[in-house]
Design a protein with these regions (language model features):
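Accessory cap/linker subdomain of secreted extracellular hydrolases
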Residues: 36-143
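Structured segments of extracytoplasmic/periplasmic soluble domains
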Residues: 14-21, 36, 139, 172, ...
Length: 204
């Protein structure tokens, strides 16, 4: 199972699902997991982005907030989380599904959290932010006891997915046997995908 960026987090999640639900019945098994620069720790990323007041992929903000709102029926309203111009244009930019993530990033016009989200959304003591944080914790794979051999790569220069995702994953992984964590200067988030793919190709 392999994936990079969001695909890396999905690859880990799929591996976990297989191990927890299908492995014992010998229906499916994972020979090896390859995951690069994934947002494995969404709650940690939320806190990190609030502290820095910046989000590498601003489009992730409405996609994550309202995606979780719909999935868990949290009752969030747009004005509890978003400022203009995102607030008035959410249905067009995001709800219509007519725009790519890159286009939504451009339309939002900023990577500064305080220019995109309300004060309550950026204050963990508020009911909205507290609930969002709890749901992000539910969706984390950090701390999962991964059984399959695995290779994780993350560039120390990654400007999109914070390195803390991979660091927290490594530090809280119960069994590190046959797990390789490759943290090095591989360039930007996009540039680091090249050595990741090269490693996967050579290892296979």
């Amino acid at each position: 199972v392999t994936g990079y960026s969001q695909g890396g987090a999905v690859a880990l999640g799929v591996t976990r699902m297989i191990e927890e639900n299908y492995h014992q019945e010998n229906e499916w098994s994972v020979r090896k997991l390859y995951a690069g620069a994934g947002p494995y720790d969404p709650a940690g990323t939320y806190l990190f982005s609030m502290e820095r007041n910046e989000m590498g992929i601003p489009a992730a903000i409405p996609l994550i907030v309202m995606g979780l709102n719909d999935a868990y029926d949290l009752g969030f309203t747009l004005d509890e989380f978003f400022l203009e111009p995102l607030l008035s244009n959410y249905e067009d930019w995001v709800g219509s599904k007519e725009y790519t993530v890159g286009q939504i990033n451009q339309l939002m016009g900023s990577t500064i959290m305080s220019e995109l989200m309300t004060e309550d959304a950026l204050t963990l003591d508020s009911p909205q932010a507290d609930m969002l944080y709890e749901v992000l914790l539910w969706n984390s794979n950090v701390g999962y006891d991964l059984q399959a051999p695995a290779y994780f790569l993350h560039s120390l220069e990654d400007e999109v997915v914070p390195l803390l995702n991979s660091i927290n994953l490594e530090e809280q992984m119960p069994d590190k046997e046959e797990k390789t964590f490759d943290f090095d200067y591989y360039g930007s988030h996009m540039e680091a995908s090249v050595p990741f793919v090269q490693y996967v190709y050579q290892d296979l």
